[in-house]
Amino acid sequence: NDHTLKDTDDFITRLKNFDIKANHFMASLDVESLFTNIPLDETIDICLQKLFDDKCVSKISNLTKSQFRTLLELAVKECYFLCNGKIYKQLDGVAMGNPLGPVLANIFLSHHESRWLDQCSIRFRPKFYVRYVDDTFVLFSHKSHLSKFSEFMNRQHPNMKFTYEAENDKKLNFLDVLVEKSGNKISTSIYRKPTFSGLYSKFSSFGPMQYKTGLIRTRCIEY
């Protein structure tokens, strides 16, 4: 949907194209343990609804709805792990490290958040709302709206629990960006966590080449 961010560059572009007011208050929302709290059956239903109701599948595959459901269930529900010599099966949620994790998280939240925002009272609805997987950046017309909006969001789905961080001294970090507000002006710079050491694996180390070249591209874009 329109609220989903592709990357940091997309976030900066959207933010700088937004008409910032001097009274706007910045905050970020985070979904607690999103991947392990994704309801798989509900999310699979959402996937099938979007694929088959919009007839997307017929353009690329001859699979039936039942066959597609079976494939999705095999990909995300047959997850086992070994702990203290015992084998366990994960009953719900996306397993950590599953490549489908970010995809299913985006599908689930994208399906719900537009409706949640429409149902939210206009009195404390955010003026600006964008999300990257489980991290959301919002702008309110008053700082008191943040707690009200957080309470509203925490009532929407039993699996989704949101925490928030408010701006401090007109500054807020989101993803790897430090956002600073001065009047109706916004400036951005690179944000580094206090634990950042600046150390990276050697280029000659044994690892996928796409990860190494991806890191170089990312650093070039940042600077």
Write out the residue ranges for each language-model feature.
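Charged structural interfaces that engage phosphate-rich ligands
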Residues: 1-223
